[in-house]
Design a protein with these regions (language model features):
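Short helical segment in ABC ATPase nucleotide-binding domains corresponding to the A-loop/adjacent helical element
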Residues: 38-46, 56, 164
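Conserved ABC ATPase signature
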Residues: 75-79, 83
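Hydrophobic anchor residue at the start of the ABC signature
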Residues: 89
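A short, proline-enriched helix->beta-strand linker immediately N-terminal to the Walker B motif
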Residues: 94-98
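Catalytic Walker B motif of ABC-type/P-loop ATPase nucleotide-binding domains
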Residues: 100-103
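Catalytic "switch" loops of ABC-type ATPases
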Residues: 27-34, 138
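Conserved ABC transporter NBD signature motif
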Residues: 3-18
Length: 198
């Protein structure tokens, strides 16, 4: 989609790169059942002809960091939902994107797994120094994962509100964020913005 006005530039002010380093993760893992987890997470590298020793070492480290090293030769049907989402994220991170676009990446998971996986993924993305834009309909998830929440209007979608999130916590995990003293305030603000539309 072209912008109505202006241009969109991501880490490329002179326009010299052919493609921006953007990773995209859908709400469903879309792992191929006929490929092993290892073959699934290296698929992007394979397509881009980038299966270098350095990239393979990076994938091996990600598999270890995400607790999937022992499962890399398994098929997706042998993994839990949370493990499959971790594999999908590794596939996204394997190409070393600077910007991650996550479209409801945890919505297919049960609540407990969703909390654990979102916490793991958020911490790993922060540790890697990546920027994440996440689409979610879960207010608690938005508050606990984001530095800034954008509320969109009904169709056609426009930015209705921008709410910076500042939680006073030592532990910045999404699970701990739900216990921050400011959390109820932000939840109420977002809820009011959303109920204004109905």
């Amino acid at each position: 989609l072209a912008p109505e006005t202006g241009t969109i530039v991501v880490n490329n002010p002179d326009g010299s790169l052919h493609y921006p380093r953007i990773g995209y993760m859908l709400q469903h893992d879309h792992l191929f059942e006929w490929r092993t987890i290892y073959q699934n997470v290296t698929l992007g590298l394979e397509i881009h002809h980038a299966l270098t020793p350095e990239r393979i070492a990076h994938v091996e480290q990600l598999l270890s960091d995400y607790g999937l090293e022992k499962f890399k030769n398994k098929r997706p049907c042998e993994l839990s939902g949370g493990m499959k989402q971790r594999a999908a994220l590794i596939r996204t991170l394997a190409l070393d994107p600077q910007l991650l676009l996550l479209d409801e990446p945890f919505s297919a998971l049960d609540y407990q797994t969703r909390l654990m996986v979102s916490s793991d993924i958020c911490q790993l993305i922060r540790k890697a120094g990546k920027t994440m834009i996440i689409v979610t309909h879960d207010l608690s998830e938005a508050i606990s994962l984001a530095d800034k929440v954008y509320v969109l209007s009904a169709r056609p979608a426009t930015i209705k509100t921008v709410l910076p999130i500042q939680l006073t916590l030592q532990d910045s995990s999404p699970l701990a964020a739900r216990n921050a003293p400011e959390f109820p305030y932000y939840f109420k603000q977002l809820w009011e913005e959303l109920t204004d539309e109905t």
